Regions:
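Conserved AMP-binding/adenylate-forming core of the ANL superfamily
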Residues: 13-44, 150-153
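Gly/Ser/Thr-rich phosphate-binding loop
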Residues: 237-292, 302
Length: 456
């Protein structure tokens, strides 16, 4: 994109191409644009739109309509009332866009069904590059969610970078299903922005349960693509659903093991592509996890590693971004991920990585889900919450001993039915500690505490 250019079209797709699978079938680019323009003329006169639409097509349409109307879309880290209210308090000139109502905040329904009869458009809107189009909030996994402003220049050039990184040699249209919400940066980039500049038709549904994911995939024609997270695809694999060929599985939000990637590739006849990125910078690298340990950086990005920190640079980013990760450069445009900056722990004078410990926990054959963590800064021992049906905490401890030093063995280990993951599959520290303390207090109150559920 020439630096002198002041605007960029909202999509580079052909008008006759299919861009979405809506509730009533395929939607062409021409139909989509006409509906977005019509919706833009109906939106309330506010600066900010909090887009909480549960239907991905409604979110897509609402976002593009807001962009055309010159409004900025706010994307909370989740749809919980307290989170949304905090965003509304911080950005007062706002309204709710979608199917969620809250007292004291104006709501506008996308109502995409009423727009279905509008005559397809032949005009493609141009958007000023300096226009503030979205504010995306971090997941809050390491603290309070923070806002990140996204200008049109950042979004469109990021989408073009992602197209080059993710759609390598892809000529046929991909029919894409996403299990992560569009309000999250990972879901936003792949299921909302990428279809505007790549041969992708995105499904309107956001399935959560394994059977629903499998059925939604089967309803799409080949070639299919799945945008998901390790937690979601692991559950999908473990549910023994009917096999359906998936051309590409794109995964992000948490590290994926090579073992899981290999199992997914074999079961679904797929290629698993893991994505590295963050809310602040977006998608910046990829790897074929089943066969590669190094990350391949996108052409648009560069890394500067030194003095205990890593800076990310790209021409479409308004400023350098400091990664909350530790990386090691390993050749041209390649790097090795060493863990989160905050995941190093010191136990009994020894330093260890929580990311590595959790990788070893998740590698156990009987563990469906789990997390090893430090309950608080003063703790002298790690703890773990583990989903392992039919297993006892002592069994998990014995299985961990061959691969983890004694100082880093988690004690206590609590067996739980499930972990309180966000829609993206992430776990926030606040929720983990809250669940841990709730279980610990309940155990402490039991007169006859069962040794099978806890290890000391």
């Amino acid at each position: 994109m020439p630096s002198s250019q002041r605007s960029h079209v909202i999509t580079s797709r052909g008008l006759d191409e299919i861009i979405a699978h809506g509730r009533d079938g395929e939607v062409s680019v021409a139909q989509f644009l006409a509906r977005a323009v019509a919706l833009a003329g109906k939106l309330p006169d506010h600066r900010y739109a909090i887009n909480l639409a549960a239907d991905r097509y409604d979110f897509f349409l609402g976002f593009c309509a807001a962009v055309i109307a010159g409004q900025c879309t706010l994307m909370p880290s989740n749809r919980q009332q307290q989170t949304v209210q905090q965003v509304a308090d911080d950005f007062a000139d706002c309204y709710l866009l979608g199917d969620v109502s809250m007292d004291g905040i104006e709501r506008f329904d996308v109502d995409s069904d009423s727009l279905a009869t509008i005559t397809p458009s032949v005009d493609i809107p141009e958007i000023p590059l300096h226009q503030l189009c979205a504010i995306v909030f971090t997941s809050g996994s390491t603290g309070r969610p923070t806002p990140n402003r996204k200008y049109w220049k950042t979004l469109v050039e990021g989408a073009l970078s992602n197209a080059a990184l993710l759609m390598q040699n892809q000529k046929a249209r991909l029919n894409l299903l996403a299990t992560v919400p569009p309000q999250h940066m990972w879901g936003f980039e792949t299921s909302i922005l990428l279809p505007l500049y790549s041969k992708i038709a995105v499904s309107h549904v956001t399935p959560f349960f394994p059977q629903d994911i499998a059925e939604s995939l089967a309803s799409l024609s080949e070639p299919r693509a799945l945008v998901s997270s390790p937690a979601h695809v692991s559950a999908l694999l473990g549910a023994n659903v009917a096999k359906v060929k998936i051309h590409r599985i794109f995964s992000a939000t948490a590290p994926m093991s090579a073992e899981l990637a290999g199992q997914l590739e074999q079961y679904f006849d797929a290629r698993v592509v893991e994505i590295f990125g963050c809310t602040e910078a977006g998608t910046m690298a990829r790897r074929n996890t089943a066969s590669e340990s190094l990350w391949q950086l996108a052409d648009a990005f560069s890394l500067e590693v030194g003095e205990g920190r890593t800076l990310v640079r790209a021409s479409h980013l308004p400023e350098d971004v400091e990664l909350q990760d530790r990386v090691e450069l390993a050749g041209h445009k390649q790097f090795r991920w060493l863990g989160r900056s905050q995941d190093m722990v010191n136990i009994a004078g020894k330093r260890g990585s929580l990311a590595d410990l959790n990788h070893r926990l998740m590698a156990l054959p009987d563990v469906i889900d789990g997390v090893i963590f430090l309950p608080d800064e003063d703790s002298k021992r790690l703890a773990a919450l583990v989903v392992a049906p039919g297993m006892q905490a002592s069994d998990i401890l014995e299985q961990l001993k061959p691969s983890i030093e004694p100082a880093f063995l988690p004690r206590p280990i609590y067996i739980v039915a499930m972990l309180p993951r966000q829609e993206t599959g992430k776990l926030t520290r606040e929720i983990i500690v809250e669940l841990f303390e709730k279980i610990r207090r309940a155990r402490a109150q039991q007169d006859d505490e069962s040794p099978s559920n806890q290890t000391h």
